[in-house]
């Protein structure tokens, strides 16, 4: 197992959170401003960290613990967030936000579930 796969009880450099800061499930918007929109729907929450494009809050939704961490734009910054959050205990990640599509059968507002990426 490489160092990047080892569980850690230390605060992670980029996302600036440790194991006590996040829930098992984490929503991942790109824009840090979307953290406010997401947490407004929750029962309650606490801001846990903000560093560069990464902003994290943890709370509950219908009595279920949940976290949100913004990732910034693009796959590299998202990969950093997922790897560091996994190191401190997050197990489930759901990317939320907007995207574009070149398929003519897709309309604005369609739910898109990615099955793979290149």
Task: Annotate each PLM feature.
Residues 2-118:
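Metabolite-binding pocket within alpha/beta catalytic cores that recognizes anionic/polar moieties
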């Amino acid at each position: 197992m490489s160092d990047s796969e080892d569980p850690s009880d230390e605060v992670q450099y980029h996302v600036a959170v440790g194991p006590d800061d996040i829930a098992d499930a984490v929503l991942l918007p790109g824009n840090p401003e979307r953290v406010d929109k997401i947490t407004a729907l929750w029962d309650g929450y606490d801001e846990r960290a903000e560093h560069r494009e990464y902003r994290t809050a943890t709370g509950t939704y219908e009595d279920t613990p949940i976290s949100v961490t913004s990732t910034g734009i693009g796959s590299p910054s998202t990969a950093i967030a997922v790897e560091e959050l996994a190191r401190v205990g997050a197990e489930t990640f759901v990317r939320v936000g907007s995207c574009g599509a070149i398929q003519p059968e897709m309309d604005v507002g369609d739910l898109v579930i990615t099955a793979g990426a290149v």
